[in-house]
């Protein structure tokens, strides 16, 4: 077993400083944020994907620290009812997947997302109670019309 940490706990520090602190604490692995609510304080996938030099520098910095990546974190809401927000979170996820491939990281942590309660929704809304019966219609919409189709498409 290895001890890891979600690297965003030190998002106010430069990557090198954060890695040094983690190493001094006995941490062996990190889960850096790559977008969404996790932010991109230490890893900006679009920058690393666009620049082989930046990617190489990141890998060298990580290797020099003695730490490894357990997973990449991208906790957004790609099914947000606001199409602009949904697209931004979707792009973060796509870039995180591409970066994981480049880094040889086989795990990404994310949120499935929270759609609205109908096509006209402006805000995410998740039903937590099975009654009244209208709530079951909302859940059916969220699962059958939004979440399942989104993730089936994303997986391809």
Region roles according to the model:
Residues 1-4:
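Extreme N-terminal starter segment of soluble prokaryotic enzymes
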Residues 51-73:
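Short hydrophobic interaction/assembly module
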Residues 32-59, 113-119:
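Glycine-rich, proline-tolerant flexible connector loops at the mouths of alpha/beta enzymes
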Residues 16-38, 103-107:
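Catalytic domains of carbohydrate-active enzymes, especially glycoside hydrolases
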Residues 17, 56-57, 61-64, 78-156:
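Active-site acidic/histidine proton-transfer and metal-coordination neighborhood
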Residues 13:
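Residues that form or flank phosphate/diphosphate-binding pockets in enzymes
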């Amino acid at each position: 077993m290895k001890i890891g940490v979600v690297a965003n706990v030190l998002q106010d520090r430069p990557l090198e400083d954060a890695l040094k602190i983690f190493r001094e604490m006995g941490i062996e692995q990190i889960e850096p944020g790559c977008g969404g609510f996790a932010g991109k304080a230490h890893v900006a996938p679009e920058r690393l994907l666009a620049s082989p030099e930046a990617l190489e520098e990141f890998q060298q910095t990580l290797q020099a620290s003695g730490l490894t990546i357990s997973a990449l974190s991208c906790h957004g809401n790609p099914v947000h009812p606001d199409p602009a927000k949904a697209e931004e979170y979707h792009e973060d996820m796509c870039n995180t997947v591409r970066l994981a491939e480049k880094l040889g990281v086989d795990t990404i942590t994310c949120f499935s997302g929270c759609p609205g309660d109908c096509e006209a929704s402006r805000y995410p809304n998740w039903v937590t109670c099975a009654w009244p019966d209208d709530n079951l219609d909302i859940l059916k919409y969220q699962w059958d019309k939004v979440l399942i189709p989104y993730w089936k498409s994303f997986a391809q």
